[in-house]
Amino acid sequence: MDLIKIAEEAFATGKQHPSFKAGDTVTVAYRIIEGNKERVQLYRGVVIKIAGHGDKKRFTVRKMSGTVGVERIFPIESPAIDSIEVNKVGKVRRAKLYYLRALTGKKARIKEKRVNN
């Protein structure tokens, strides 16, 4: 067996996350350790990019904090991620939504895809 695959399986977290794509609005709950205290912080925003494959897969989430856009990159297999929740399913035609960086206000909205539950 390949040594890389053995190492990937050893460090895999084994968590099951929902499937999502660029344009979806997600809430990521991740653990933050400050000194000897640990807390869970929620980060809600639009997925603008999914990159990599396997255990190196990562996604970028963009949110507006006041008037400043904040982007954060999360590795999918990170042990610090508690959960990922898909809030809205977006309707976009691109895999990488870098054009959202230049848009502000209502122009930066993404159409919502209706999902039958």
Curated annotation (Swiss-Prot):
GO terms for cellular component: cytosolic large ribosomal subunit. Gene3D superfamilies: 2.30.30.790. Keywords: Ribonucleoprotein, Ribosomal protein. The gene is rplS. Belongs to the bacterial ribosomal protein bL19 family. GO terms for biological process: translation. InterPro entries: Ribosomal_bL19, Ribosomal_bL19_CS, Ribosomal_bL19_sf, Translation_prot_SH3-like_sf. GO terms for molecular function: structural constituent of ribosome. It holds the Pfam family Ribosomal_L19. This protein is located at the 30S-50S ribosomal subunit interface and may play a role in the structure and function of the aminoacyl-tRNA binding site. This is Large ribosomal subunit protein bL19. It comes from Bacteroides thetaiotaomicron (strain ATCC 29148 / DSM 2079 / JCM 5827 / CCUG 10774 / NCTC 10582 / VPI-5482 / E50). PANTHER family: LARGE RIBOSOMAL SUBUNIT PROTEIN BL19M, RIBOSOMAL PROTEIN L19.
